[in-house]
Amino acid sequence: MMRVGRTLANKKEIVAELKERLRESQMALVIDYQGLSDAEMKDLRQRLRKCNASCKVTKNTLMELAVKESDTWQPITQFLKGPSAFLLLKDDIGGAIKAYQEFQKATKKTTLRGGVMEGRALDEAQVKAIGDLPSKEQLMAQIAGALNAVTAKIAIGIKEVPASLARATQAIADKGAA
């Protein structure tokens, strides 16, 4: 039986879709997905979807065509060796990296080749460091807590000025009466 490959039009469509997905992404990771079952791949996609990220499996040559004219994504070409899956991260980068790391720990079947962010190639250690950063929600909570503490201290300070003035006035009055 002869196997029919993708048509040129179909390949162009895939490249256009990859370009669009990359345009929407802040970071891309390249993993070796060899050995994953369909169920495991579905599990990975579901974990990533919760963080507004996606997993795209495509031929390396099609990804090369998609990034050819983009300085931002060009460094990804150095990771295109063997079967590749592309994790495209949009908003919650830290959450998506953590989701992948948890998946990797559970299956022990994938390896992270590297990633690209803002036109820079990242190795596994750099990707892990980004994943260890607090999420946007955690940072907002920390900032809100810090602002709340500052306003509380200001309020206490403002309240303390008249109270100390009153105590000083009372001390002078007591001293004068004695």
Curated annotation (Swiss-Prot):
Coiled-coil intervals: none
Keyword list, A-Z: Ribonucleoprotein, Ribosomal protein, RNA-binding, rRNA-binding
Function: Forms part of the ribosomal stalk, playing a central role in the interaction of the ribosome with GTP-bound translation factors.
Gene: rplJ
SUPFAM superfamilies (UniProt xref): Ribosomal protein L10-like (SSF160369)
Protein name: Large ribosomal subunit protein uL10
Species classification: Bacteria, Bacillati, Cyanobacteriota, Cyanophyceae, Acaryochloridales
UniProt xrefs under InterPro entries: Ribosomal_uL10, Ribosomal_uL10-like_sf, Ribosomal_uL10_bac, Ribosomal_uL10_bac_type
HAMAP family tied to this protein: Ribosomal_uL10
Known partners and oligomeric status: Part of the ribosomal stalk of the 50S ribosomal subunit. The N-terminus interacts with L11 and the large rRNA to form the base of the stalk. The C-terminus forms an elongated spine to which L12 dimers bind in a sequential fashion forming a multimeric L10(L12)X complex.
PANTHER family in UniProt: 39S RIBOSOMAL PROTEIN L10, MITOCHONDRIAL
Gene3D superfamilies reported in the protein's UniProt record: 3.30.70.1730, 6.10.250.290
Highest taxon in the source lineage: Bacteria
GO molecular function per UniProt: large ribosomal subunit rRNA binding
Any single biological process term in GO: translation
A GO CC term assigned to this protein in UniProt: ribosome
Family classification: Belongs to the universal ribosomal protein uL10 family.
Organism: Thermosynechococcus vestitus (strain NIES-2133 / IAM M-273 / BP-1)
